[in-house]
Amino acid sequence: MELWRQCTHWLIQCRVLPPSHRVTWEGAQVCELAQALRDGVLLCQLLNNLLPHAINLREVNLRPQMSQFLCLKNIRTFLSTCCEKFGLKRSELFEAFDLFDVQDFGKVIYTLSALSWTPIAQNKGIMPFPTEDSALGDEDIYSGLSDQIDDTAEEDEDLYDCVENEEAEGDEIYEDLMRSESVPTPPKMTEYDKRCCCLREIQQTEEKYTDTLGSIQQHFMKPLQRFLKPQDMETIFVNIEELLSVHTHFLKELKDALSGPGATMLYQVFIKYKERFLVYGRYCSQVESAIKHLDQVATAREDVQMKLEECSQRANNGRFTLRDLLMVPMQRVLKYHLLLQELVKHTQDTTEKENLRLALDAMRDLAQCVNEVKRDNETLRQITNFQLSIENLDQSLANYGRPKIDGELKITSVERRSKTDRYAFLLDKALLICKRRGDSYDLKASVNLHSFQVRDDSSGERDNKKWSHMFLLIEDQGAQGYELFFKTRELKKKWMEQFEMAISNIYPENATANGHDFQMFSFEETTSCKACQMLLRGTFYQGYRCYRCRAPAHKECLGRVPPCGRQDFSGTMKKDKLHRRAQDKKRNELGLPKMEVCQEYYGIPPPPGAFGPFLRLNPGDIVELTKAEAEHTWWEGRNTATNEVGWFPCNRVRPYVHGPPQDLSVHLWYAGPMERAGAEGILTNRSDGTYLVRQRVKDTAEFAISIKYNVEVKHIKIMTSEGLYRITEKKAFRGLPELVEFYQQNSLKDCFKSLDTTLQFPYKEPERRAINKPPVGSTKYFGTAKARYDFCARDRSELSLKEGDIIKILNKKGQQGWWRGEIYGRIGWFPSNYVEEDYSEYC
């Protein structure tokens, strides 16, 4: 067996790789193992599996998203721990770039083999590799691997299932504390019985939690005051006493509400305390530092360590340490929406259900706020790592916003025309251009993105030539500029997308709507959005604030904030609507020319400032011009595929020419003129997913799709106008083949919520083939959700949503409060409290 396959088997035995990972599949290649290990996360977890707590996972970035800086940091943590705790010699270790750039993957396998033979690893009872009779000559298969590695690949989420989760540890402590003596469950429970159980659980767990806060104060804070300095006490206990005060009052009002008839006033208590629970913002943002400081003090002073053990013994017979108990408040505040969700599920009265939904929304919003504080703490740790590695940096990197992407590139400038190797860090507001010196970086230039724009340049690109893929970074005044070169076309696209996202964060759509001047802003206090009343989340740059009236808002809510300095804007909305209708009518009367998109455009370069929003274009889209001058390079138009209006470079389109009528009879799905009854006769005895497209007999210019789904035949009208075909207003196609091809790959549920299927089997295909053929382009997903609010992505890994969008849920195992989903072919993370799952009423 090849050495890399033996390594794979060993990693599976060490519970690092899932047994079903694609690297184990027939036909798997060594590059798939390299891709799985490149970010260093699994290697760090490997050491912890072999020797518990060998690495503090707080020092590891568990979601590096192929950031070269973070991946290399993880890899170097693995290598240093191999030496310090496993006794490997320096000569047995690979270099960090041997793995990240896959320069010598054979050396990586050699290091893992040496690790497998260490006494610590062998004590686990796992067979090391290679075995004595194994051949070692795998060198040929490792050559050229660096060209096969995909720097733009999405993370394989299943890979991280085995990684330890500190949140799960805190959850176990919480569940242990809240556990009550098991009460026999009646064999048959009514909905009323289940509701009573929910109410009882809410009260009992709140009593235990309040007792826990009291125990921390009584058995730890008071005794430790004589051992610790005031600043140590404040750092370790944060605002525990404030939490205790809030929950003492909350518990009293909770009991009063629960003792009332039917507990109908319970919802008011949660809504009232949402604002008071904002004190958790401070606690959750500082608890990690608190635990770290506690560990440091206990390690440095034996008397404190002994006192902590004594306190723990008195508080709970030594079951839980202070470190354990400090994790509980974070867990409790994240449980309220789950408790209320279950209560809503078993509440029958319509009015009560609606009221409880209000409380549920309030607690979901609070939970999302807490989760974002945790996420921003992780981001700030990442920024700190960047800061410590960059020399000549004269201000805090956090002032530039959140990191977008980092990596190697080549660069030319106005002053220096020859290509220079550089390492760049892109954040929301700035691009930092550095020269790498070993493990540190020397800052050469800081580009303020406020005054720059990006322009694509594909003129010199050749697919087979590295570092030929370039775009321009140009100052608005034209005095300064850079050419940025990337190794591959895919990397260039990834960087351009992140530049587009950064610029859209600085200059968001609707930033000047209703007379406002919205700018990115870091709020010191927890604040609610002026438009939707939901909380602005996180610890820095949580949203936007109007420079004039100081109104706070989410990015996605900017267009809905009342006019600057005025309270009511319903009249403005009405006027805008009437104006829009008049414009549409005028456009139709003029019969302006149509253009076909020949090159995609996603807002880079952005239109000149005075023009307006950009228009997103995809090849094949049809654009109806609204403003166009032959001598101007920027035109305005309406994309008939999306109905959006905006500006775009005129070189991205060409005149639209109606082609000759297509011969549809060549397609296996086309049935010609046919009534509904005829389609039903053909499809009734066929497999689910079998479909046909028919010409409607009553109107030969119209078409329809008939499809077998859930034992019934469904019919979908295809609307035709302006030479385009569509089954929903959201998306249009130039021809029927394009429409059919799209819905072969994308579920019809995006248009019709009860029709969760793709167009799978053309009716002219023999049934035998149709049964064996897997669904085309189907992605494994776990139900769907409907967006309740708009959401604007902040970076490339997030998914923008519009209210009413239907999202396929791919994963719920990411950072708390975030799910991974797919919509319109895009995949990314979105906040779970912005959606309603499976069209149910929260449950």
Swiss-Prot record:
Residues 669-763 form the SH2 domain. A zinc finger (Phorbol-ester/DAG-type) spans 515-564. It comes from the Eukaryota. One of its GO terms (cellular component) is cell-cell junction. GO terms for molecular function: guanyl-nucleotide exchange factor activity; phosphorylation-dependent protein binding; phosphotyrosine residue binding; zinc ion binding. SUPFAM superfamilies: Calponin-homology domain, CH-domain, DBL homology domain (DH-domain), PH domain-like, SH2 domain, SH3-domain. Residues 590-658, 780-840 form the SH3 domain. Phosphorylated by FYN. Phosphorylated on tyrosine residues by HCK in response to IFNG and bacterial lipopolysaccharide (LPS). Residues 1-119 form the Calponin-homology (CH) domain. One of its GO terms (biological process) is immune response. Couples tyrosine kinase signals with the activation of the Rho/Rac GTPases, thus leading to cell differentiation and/or proliferation. The DH domain is involved in interaction with CCPG1. This is Proto-oncogene vav. It comes from Rattus norvegicus.
